[in-house]
Each structure stands twice: as structure tokens, then as C-alpha cells.
Amino acid sequence: ALCSTQRSAPVADEMCEQYGIPQRTTNYFELLQWVDVIYLAVPNLQHYRYAKVALEAGKHVIVEKPMACTAAQTEELAALARRKKVFLFEAMTTQYLENYNKIRELLPRIGRVKLVQCNFSQYSSRYDAFCAGETPVSFDPECAGGALMDLNVYNISYIVGLFGEPNQVHYLPNMERGIDTSGILTMEYNSFKAVSMAAKDCGAPARYVIQGTKGYILQKSTANWCGGVTFHPNQGKEEHFNLNGGRPQ
């Protein structure tokens, strides 16, 4: 079953026809009566609200990133899911990809980690409209838009999944009309620093590098794809891996 806004009903009808979806509605509560699992692809600000309603109805929930806008909201949803004995997932698959697991496996071979850098920058198709005075949802501070929530969350998950929670975090955003159109997040660990960059106002090739005393690991695709990985030892030949099947290099 599919639930959409009234405005998006024509598009929803096309999706139902294309994928053989038997039921469509614009009423979220009606949808909850038809399904066992909910996948939420609504604006960031609405994630908490819709997820909570579904969990309270005893439904399993998959939420687009970010799961919620605050840590407190996320913790509340997790507690509710445990109480209702249902599953709650953030729809971010990086940590389950084979290439990502290979990176984790390679970490001991680069020695002591010293620097980590991640760059996920892509010029948004909506940035021109934003510059012209419009306020697309992805650039609306009242809808929890911006580069941190939209793109840098991938980098954060990538880093934290490998190294755990940092000791300190600092965010340096480029602000336009109250929203971060790009920014740099620094994460401080006991013996190394991580830099996480993301931009919606400019583009650059994706680059993920983990530098250690005995070599470095390089990946040239965004965290959500986690494509081909290359291990560059200080001594010896480089090694290339791509274990994700059909995903891009």
C-alpha cells in the first residue's frame, strides 16, 4: 500500500500502476490498517511524528535518514519500539555493505590511525531556486533541511560505525538564510582527528581517506554507496577491493 499527499496523488497513482501496488490513500491512519511495516520517506521534520504514530500502532518502521531531528527524539522512538516489541530501522545501509566491512578488516594494517577525511559534496538541483529566493524543503531550516542533515549524516555514520562515538564534535557551517548549505564537522578521538565535509552549494569528487602510520585506505565514492576500496601500504603493493557486486567502483 502507498500513502501520499493529495498534491502528489497523480505521481502515487503512477507508482502503484508501475509496481503493482493494490492500495493507495492520502490518509496515514488508513494506511496503518493495511500494512505490517511502514517505510517513511517524508521531510526530515516529520520523521519523529510519523514514526511514533506507526510504532504506537504496533508497526515495524523503516525511517529515512536522519531517524529524527534530535537525540532525545531518537531515544524516545527506540524506547517505544522496544516496549511495543517491533523493529525500528534507519534506512542507511552503509554499515551492512561488504566494502565497508572490508575497510573495517583493513584498519589494523594501516597501523595507528592519525587522520580521517570524508567528503560528500554534490551541487543540489534545488540550490539555484534557493538562491533565487525560494525555500525548497531541503533548504528549509523549519523542515530540518541543510547539508548536515541531508548529506553529512552519511559521513558521520561511516566514521562512527568504524571508530565509535567521538570525544568532541565541532561543526563549522556555511550559512545562507538560516540554513547550512555546506559545512565541515570535526570529530576528536583519543589519538586521531576526523574531518567530515558535505556540501549542497558546490560539488567535488567523493573522497574518503583513513590515514595511519603504516599506510592509508582510499575510497572514491560516497558513503552510501561505499564503492571500490584501495589499501595503500607504506611499503609493498597497493591492493584494490570491490565486494559490493554491481555497485559502482
Q: Each predicted region: which residue ranges?
A:
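N-terminal Rossmann-like dinucleotide-binding module
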Residues: 1-19
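Predominantly a Rossmann-like dinucleotide-binding segment in NAD(P)-dependent oxidoreductases
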Residues: 94-167
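Contiguous beta-strand/loop segments that form the cofactor/metal-binding neighborhood of enzyme cores
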Residues: 155-228
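C-terminal helical cap and adjacent loop that interface with cofactors, partners, or active-site loops
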Residues: 225, 235-249
